[in-house]
């Protein structure tokens, strides 16, 4: 997605060898017009696949997921990273390791929001090592629902997340694919959408 790549080049900041900071439009402050375009692109790609739910993980996946769900006219569910007192029964959980935060969290979704009839599109902000998507897949499959595809806003192609997910049989479609960081600049691979 050319618009996204241009925004990454303009406002993204490289930290160290493998972290891209995009807090001015995705991971802290949200550019809703860009998120709306992201949602439209994902929705156009998956419009004929029978998607019934969009699922993401809090927090930075929520914005692109909600705009995708809006464009598809289906509900969006986000997995919570912390259990609260209102989630006391009927909870589907999985362990997820965060590459950026370097911690493992138990993420959860109330089972009443997913059913065996659901065809789910996972949307997330980043794909690095694939652990967030893997955790969401586990939760979705615990409910008996089907993962149709995984939509990623920014993929770190130099990490093994895509390979892990595709080898397990899940299609991955990314709007921006980072090949590497070179001389303080992002180098892109050809994106899927």
From Swiss-Prot:
Protein's gene: xpt
UniProt cross-references to HAMAP family, sorted A to Z: XPRTase
UniProt binding sites for 5-phospho-alpha-D-ribose 1-diphosphate: 128-132
Source species of the chain: Streptococcus pneumoniae serotype 4 (strain ATCC BAA-334 / TIGR4)
Keyword Signal included in the entry's annotation: no
PANTHER family for this protein: HYPOXANTHINE/GUANINE PHOSPHORIBOSYLTRANSFERASE, XANTHINE PHOSPHORIBOSYLTRANSFERASE
Predominant place of localization: cytoplasm
Function: Converts the preformed base xanthine, a product of nucleic acid breakdown, to xanthosine 5'-monophosphate (XMP), so it can be reused for RNA or DNA synthesis.
Compartments it resides in: Cytoplasm
Name this protein carries in UniProt: Xanthine phosphoribosyltransferase
GO molecular function, one term: xanthine phosphoribosyltransferase activity
Record-annotated disulphide pairs: none
Positions that bind xanthine: 20, 27, 156
Gene Ontology biological-process entries: purine ribonucleoside salvage; xanthine metabolic process; XMP salvage
């Amino acid at each position: 997605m050319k618009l996204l790549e241009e925004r990454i080049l303009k406002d993204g900041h490289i930290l160290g060898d493998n972290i891209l900071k995009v807090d001015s439009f995705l991971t802290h402050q949200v550019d809703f017009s860009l998120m709306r375009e992201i949602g439209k692109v994902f929705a156009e790609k998956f419009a004929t696949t029978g998607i019934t739910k969009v699922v993401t993980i809090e927090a930075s996946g929520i914005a692109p997921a909600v705009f995708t769900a809006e464009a598809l006219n289906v509900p969006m569910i986000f997995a919570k990273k912390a259990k609260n007192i209102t989630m006391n029964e009927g909870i589907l959980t999985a362990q997820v390791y965060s590459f950026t935060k370097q911690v493992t969290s138990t993420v959860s979704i109330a089972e009443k929001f997913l059913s065996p009839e659901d065809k789910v599109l996972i949307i997330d902000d980043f794909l690095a090592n694939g652990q967030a998507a893997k955790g969401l897949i586990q939760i979705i499959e615990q409910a008996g629902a089907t993962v149709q595809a995984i939509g990623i806003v920014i993929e770190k192609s130099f990490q093994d997340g895509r390979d892990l997910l595709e080898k397990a049989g899940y299609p991955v479609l990314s709007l921006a694919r980072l090949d590497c960081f070179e001389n303080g600049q992002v180098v892109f691979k050809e994106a899927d959408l």
